Amino acid sequence: MKVRNSLKSLRARHRDNRLVRRKGRVYVINKTQRRFKARQG
C-alpha cells in the first residue's frame, strides 16, 4: 500500500478505483488492479 498526500490524482489513473473512508482515513481501493491501493497520510 502506498501513502500519498493527494489521492484525487491517483484515483484518476484507473476507472475501477474507489475512494473510501475507513476509521477517519481516506483510501483508494481497486478490486481488479490491486497495485493502485493507497492511503492518504
Curated annotation (Swiss-Prot):
One of its GO terms (biological process) is translation. GO terms for cellular component: ribonucleoprotein complex; ribosome. The keyword Ribosomal protein applies. One of its GO terms (molecular function) is structural constituent of ribosome. Keywords: Ribonucleoprotein, Ribosomal protein. It comes from the Bacteria. Belongs to the bacterial ribosomal protein bL36 family. HAMAP family: Ribosomal_bL36. This is Large ribosomal subunit protein bL36. The gene is rpmJ.
